[in-house]
């Protein structure tokens, strides 16, 4: 991902936020931020992607990324909505049940990310 970001930046692509696939190690998250912010791009940030992974893996990635300055959020759509949406389509959940499941899981992800960010601020 570092090479891709560098190549895109060198070609003139200058997003304010880079979407980064889930990373297991803090050091890798730090490298991604350093790459995104290289050469005077201090205002550029990153978000972590869920890649449709299972809850456990996404929770690990969110916790790891949130602890690093420069990661400001996440995009975990499929991880959040896939199972409840499939259950609704298969008529094993009502619409209201699916909506509640999606909202509840998303709230858990927000709380997890924000909690890890708060820990970063105290460090």
Regions found by a protein language model. Name each.
Residues 1-8, 58-64:
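Short, acidic/polar
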